[in-house]
């Protein structure tokens, strides 16, 4: 397992706001895991480990929660952050089966300076995200679209996107335009 995705956790049997304050006082984050038709699990994670490994995370960031006995494949469903200190004080994780493909929307990240724009064309972005299908651990956080070769008057279609090998397009119409340069 890719170590950068693994997050150590400990299960907890006591919960509530006073218990959550005690957990935070120990520089830990109270959290819950739900999904897969299982009961909600309450746990705690070290805030230093979470902040170090996942300083920036998206809806598509896959984590592996490891309590020493069981590894659970999860997404961050919600993270409550203190506005003043910018510290995360509670996390909701959503568990998925790592062996079952899922469909998720992934942002399209535009890179490069288009030839068409350099010639005075106007770039119009029609889709900012694309629906893809993959196993959870293969899910990209974004899809890059290199605009460098796109000329004035050209467009890029969904089917033109370069996807990682284990990721497939899950959109109904692969001929939809992503960007146009007029």
Swiss-Prot record:
User: InterPro entries, per this entry?
Assistant: Rbsml_bL25/Gln-tRNA_synth_N, Ribosomal_bL25/Gln-tRNA_synth, Ribosomal_bL25_b-dom, Ribosomal_bL25_C, Ribosomal_bL25_long, Ribosomal_L25_dom, Ribosomal_uL5_bac-type
- Alphabetical keyword list: Ribonucleoprotein, Ribosomal protein, RNA-binding, rRNA-binding
Example GO BP: translation
Q: Which GO terms describe its cellular component?
A: cytosolic large ribosomal subunit
Q: Which SUPFAM superfamilies match?
A: Ribosomal protein L25-like
A single Pfam family, by name? Ribosomal_TL5_C
Q: Which domain of life is it from?
A: Bacteria
- Gene Ontology terms, MF aspect: 5S rRNA binding; structural constituent of ribosome
Question: What this chain does, per the record?
Answer: This is one of the proteins that binds to the 5S RNA in the ribosome where it forms part of the central protuberance.
Q: How does it assemble?
A: Part of the 50S ribosomal subunit; part of the 5S rRNA/L5/L18/L25 subcomplex. Contacts the 5S rRNA. Binds to the 5S rRNA independently of L5 and L18.
Q: NCBIfam families from the xrefs? A: bL25_bact_ctc, PRK05618.3-1
Q: Which family does it belong to?
A: Belongs to the bacterial ribosomal protein bL25 family. CTC subfamily.
The molecule here is called Large ribosomal subunit protein bL25
The scientific name of the source species is Borreliella burgdorferi (strain ATCC 35210 / DSM 4680 / CIP 102532 / B31)
From the broadest rank down, the organism's phylogenetic lineage runs: Bacteria, Pseudomonadati, Spirochaetota, Spirochaetia, Spirochaetales
């Amino acid at each position: 397992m890719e170590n950068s995705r693994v997050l150590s956790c400990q299960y907890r049997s006591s919960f509530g706001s006073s218990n959550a304050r005690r957990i935070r006082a120990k520089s830990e984050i109270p959290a819950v895991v739900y999904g897969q038709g299982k009961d909600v699990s309450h746990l705690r994670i070290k805030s230093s480990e979470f902040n170090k490994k996942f300083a920036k995370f998206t809806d598509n960031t896959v984590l592996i929660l490891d309590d020493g006995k069981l590894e659970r494949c999860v997404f961050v469903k919600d993270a409550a952050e203190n506005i003043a200190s910018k510290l995360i004080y509670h996390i909701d994780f959503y568990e998925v089966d790592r062996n079952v493909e899922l469909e998720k929307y992934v942002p399209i990240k535009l890179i490069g300076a288009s030839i068409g724009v350099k010639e005075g064309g106007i770039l119009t972005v029609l889709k900012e995200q694309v629906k893809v299908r993959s196993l959870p651990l293969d899910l990209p956080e974004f899809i890059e679209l290199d605009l460098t070769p796109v000329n004035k008057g050209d467009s890029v279609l969904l089917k033109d996107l370069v996807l990682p090998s284990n990721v497939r397009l899950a959109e109904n119409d692969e001929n939809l335009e992503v960007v146009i340069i007029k």
